Amino acid sequence: MTIRQCETRPMFSLIGGVLLAACASGASAQQALSSHQHDWNQAKAPPAELVTVVRESTARFRDVRLAVAEGYGLQFGCVSGGEVGAMGMHFVNLPLVLDGQLDPARPEIVIYEPMPNGRLRLIGADFLVFAADWDKAHPGSPPQLMGQLFHLFEAPNRFGLPAFYTLHVWAWKENPSGTFVNWHAGVSCDAFDGEVQ
């Protein structure tokens, strides 16, 4: 699949899903969050272990068509941070975002970098949970995955989403700034011919 073949799903589909989830009963949302306690969150695993799990679980997505076939769709165009680098193109699996569960083998988002030849290169994964849901189910305990703490994105934000916790894992392209930082200094949106955020 090339960059031009990628269709950005309308942002309202993600926002609509968020609003539907917010209207769900608080009890069922809390139950979904608290019933999915993994040893992943309890263990203080070395960073390499999380990277290995992410690589093993996303290897098939080097072909973006397989990611699309499994429910991932492009949201937000290509996310650029100017001097700090970029986050690339986020292919979001909305049902995984809305289930409120964190599993290192099932990332909510897979991330691609647009290449000059028009192809997309898998560079990482992103785990995301909405802050209100997480904080309600786990008061005073920010999310972590295999010992890696998530970052909080407050609202309002550039994505138009409610506050959320996120953890980028640059498993397929080494990041000189760190494996789990939000921005990748070596990623660019220059080859993307759509909307750059």
Regions found by a protein language model. Give the residues of each.
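N-terminal secretory signal peptides that target proteins for export/translocation
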Residues: M1-R9
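Low-complexity, intrinsically disordered regions enriched in charged/polar residues
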Residues: T8-R9, S13-L14, K44, A48
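Bacterial N-terminal signal peptides
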Residues: S13-C23
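Sec/Tat signal peptide C-region and signal peptidase I cleavage site
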Residues: S25-A29
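Primary mode marks residue(s) on the alpha4-beta5-alpha5 output face of response regulator receiver
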Residues: Q30-Q197
